[in-house]
């Protein structure tokens, strides 16, 4: 019951995850029609997100069997590369969706996605840089609502928004120099 509730909150188009003869099945509601799917038929992004949500919910239910709503459990969850396999649009909402589904959980996540970074307040971010084999925290002046290119340059430390090694980029750079 807790797992089903978590899946429904996190992914409203999906419901009723259940064991089947072969693996796990889930119902997908789209365009007024429900389709039964095997987990294997879903994209890696949906599979990893469903697995993560079902795992967190199962652990909450197991740790609090007498709690009326185990999704209200307090705790800390670590997630490495929370954006892994997710479409950029979903990367923008994954943390908000997780916090809505598990409101009393503190999520500690790693990411290299400007989409994820731009969904978080700067005071909640820790950018770690390694200098001389020592970790160093870099202050983040802004993040929430920032454009991806700005996050890449100013938060994630990407040197250029373009792939400088591409011939077309080098030609464009040369053209701009000639014009200037």
Please identify what each model-predicted range represents.
Residues 1-8, 152-155, 160, 172:
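Coupling/switch segment of ABC-type P-loop NTPase heads
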Residues 1-31, 179-180:
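Coupling/switch/interface segments within P-loop NTPase motor domains and analogous charged loops
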């Amino acid at each position: 019951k807790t797992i089903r509730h978590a899946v429904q909150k996190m992914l409203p188009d999906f419901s009723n995850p259940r064991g089947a003869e072969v693996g796990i099945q889930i119902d997908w509601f789209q365009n007024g029609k429900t389709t039964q799917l095997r987990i294997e038929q879903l994209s890696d992004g949906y599979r990893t997100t469903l697995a993560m949500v079902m795992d967190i919910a199962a652990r909450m239910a197991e740790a609090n069997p007498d709690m009326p709503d185990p999704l209200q459990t307090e705790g800390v969850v670590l997630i490495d590369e929370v954006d892994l396999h997710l479409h950029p649009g979903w990367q923008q909402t994954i943390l908000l969706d997780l916090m809505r589904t598990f409101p009393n959980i503190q999520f500690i996540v790693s990411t290299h996605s400007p989409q994820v970074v731009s969904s978080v307040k700067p005071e909640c971010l820790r950018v770690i840089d390694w200098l001389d084999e020592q970790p160093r925290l870099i202050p983040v002046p802004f993040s929430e609502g920032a454009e991806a290119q700005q996050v890449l340059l100013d938060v994630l430390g990407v040197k250029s928004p373009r792939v400088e090694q591409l011939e077309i980029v080098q030609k464009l750079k040369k053209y701009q120099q000639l014009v200037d």
